[in-house]
Amino acid sequence: MFTFDRIPLSICPQRQQHFITTNSERRAFMESLGINALIEYPFTEKLMNTDAGEFIEDIIIRKLRAKVVVVGTDYHFGKGRSGDADMLVKCGPEYGFETIVVEKEKYQDKEISSTYVREELVLGHMETVNVLMGRPYSIEGIVCPGNQFGRKIKIPTMNIYPQESKLLPPNGVYASITQIDGKEYGGVTNIGTKPTVSTDQVIGVETNLFDYEEDAYGKHIKVKLLHFIRPEMKFESIEALSKQMESDAQFSKSMLML
């Protein structure tokens, strides 16, 4: 599998771009598919300005020594996106490689693309996002200490902080499945700043797992968001928040059929 270490727009500093899947998440996903070789080629300004013909000769032929090239119908390469799938099909016989062009899948009469996924993700439409991606959208990280509020009200939680480049859904509460220690647990996850108990504006991911009672500090977890429950909100009291958290947990269990 050949890909770039960043998306082309990231070369433009004035256009900050967030990623649906980080590089580390992408590597793990590719490995799970049985792909044993992943090339993350450095995308530089020089490469961005490389002529399409030169890209074929230098990258596809000289560096990759490709015999078969598989691309999507909307694949473009080279300066100004001048190269495309048709160019590869036409040039292939001359350079000794075959080009396979894969048609895009559709969902609800709309072509599936990263743009489509982004549009649904920022709206919190997790069911649609997960269908488009072909797997649950997830956030990964190392569990770190929080403010211990969950333990005080006997609803212990795990806190992780996603990479700044990670594209997140709206702040709110979600029904979730979390992987830890090679097992999966149902739970409820809050994304946001926890305004009732904190004045910190840093966005974090806080998850309460059902039927997990071990110490998770320092462990790597993967939180899969399945259903949006409600927006994050500030409650008038700790008691009101605690009551709502219990309600959220029950709702999540019903959504997850636990």
Enumerate the predicted regions with their spans.
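Phosphate/ribose-recognition catalytic cores of enzymes acting on nucleotide-derived substrates
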Residues: G146-L258
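A structural preference for short, hydrophobic beta-strand core positions in alpha/beta folds
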Residues: M1, E40, V101-V102
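Residues in the short beta-alpha loop(s) of Rossmann-like NAD(P)-binding domains
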Residues: D5
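N-terminal Rossmann-like or analogous alpha/beta NTP/dinucleotide-binding catalytic cores
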Residues: P8-Y95
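A non-catalytic, amphipathic alpha-helix used as a structural packing/dimerization or gating element
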Residues: E25, T128-R135, A240-S247, F251
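Residue-level signal for inorganic ion chemistry
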Residues: M30, V69, V129, S176, ...
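Glycine-rich, Lys/Arg-enriched anion-binding loops that position phosphate/diphosphate groups
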Residues: G92-G192
